[in-house]
């Protein structure tokens, strides 16, 4: 019964999410006006909120410019703190190839972080940006935004004037490429990482940590994770096609991902403090093969005031 209800919900909201996408084209200046962030809106809405680790919901999204009218996928909770969900088969193989082609056609540059000129935090990596909406955007990309917004953002967040989505970031990592530990933050309330060629390596070292408190600042968490290891601590999303994919997979800390899968997670605490959730600290581990991923960041700009 839950599955049927989810299907109906996805279709209706997909059609009505265009309001969010249009607003995303230019973030509202209303973000500068501090507003109260009540508890229970920065995390997952129902029925995702009640999903237990290991439990799965079936869903679908509508497809634009494709012979098929929908893509069926599943949503599995893989961690409670932070809220992390794995979307199995969210993208078709054809859509993955299309995203990769969009990046190559548009030209790729050496990737930087939010700090202009910083190429040391992200190594051996090229980047391209694809508009998430507007006349220069891709119908595939805007469709992914619509589907994701519908499922993962609360009605309150979607209705806020300062809500929006950044352009899709497409990344190509060469052998040895990596991205050091970081928290997406900066008013990015929610993140989706798409696995374009099935090479994973996303590690959340503090996910579902039950061994002491997590510090509430960057310096503290970076010191804490120094002695932790992927596959032994936190949650490690590992490419099923990786050369080392068969090593150390039979434990609760490792989740295998394939081409077309995506991981979705929340970056802020949801108890009313509107503070960063440092359990969402993550990194892109050094890769032993070429790795293609794409990112979408969903913003609530008023969070910058807290």
Language model features with spans:
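Fe(II)/2-oxoglutarate oxygenase catalytic core
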Residues: 9, 14-16, 20-23, 27-306
């Amino acid at each position: 019964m839950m599955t049927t209800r989810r299907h109906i919900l996805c279709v209706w909201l997909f059609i009505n999410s265009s309001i969010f996408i249009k607003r995303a084209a230019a973030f509202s200046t209303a973000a500068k006006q501090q507003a109260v962030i009540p508890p229970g809106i920065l995390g997952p809405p129902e029925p995702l909120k009640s999903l237990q680790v290991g439990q799965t919901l079936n869903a679908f999204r509508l497809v634009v410019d494709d012979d098929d009218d929908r893509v069926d996928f599943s949503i599995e909770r893989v961690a409670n703190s932070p809220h992390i969900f794995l979307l199995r088969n969210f993208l078709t193989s054809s859509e993955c190839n299309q995203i990769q082609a969009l990046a190559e056609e548009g030209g790729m540059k050496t990737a930087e972080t939010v700090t202009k000129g910083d190429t040391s935090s992200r190594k051996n990596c090229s980047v391209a940006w694809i508009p998430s909406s507007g006349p220069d955007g891709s119908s595939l990309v805007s469709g992914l935004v619509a589907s994701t917004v519908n499922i993962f953002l609360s009605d309150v967040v979607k209705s806020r004037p300062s809500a929006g989505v950044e352009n899709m970031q497409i990344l190509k990592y060469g052998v040895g490429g990596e991205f050091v530990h970081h928290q997406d933050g900066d008013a990015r309330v929610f993140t989706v990482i798409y696995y374009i060629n099935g090479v994973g390596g996303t590690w959340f070292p503090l996910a579902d940590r039950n061994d002491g408190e997590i510090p509430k600042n960057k310096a503290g968490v970076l010191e804490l994770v120094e002695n932790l290891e992927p596959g032994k601590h936190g949650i490690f999303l590992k490419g099923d096609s990786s050369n080392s994919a068969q090593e150390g997979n039979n434990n609760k800390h490792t989740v295998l991902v394939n081409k077309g899968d995506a991981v979705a997670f929340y970056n802020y605490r949801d108890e009313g403090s509107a503070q960063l959730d440092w359990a969402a600290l993550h990194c892109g581990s050094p890769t032993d093969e070429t790795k293609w991923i794409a990112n979408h960041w969903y913003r609530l700009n008023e969070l910058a005031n807290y």
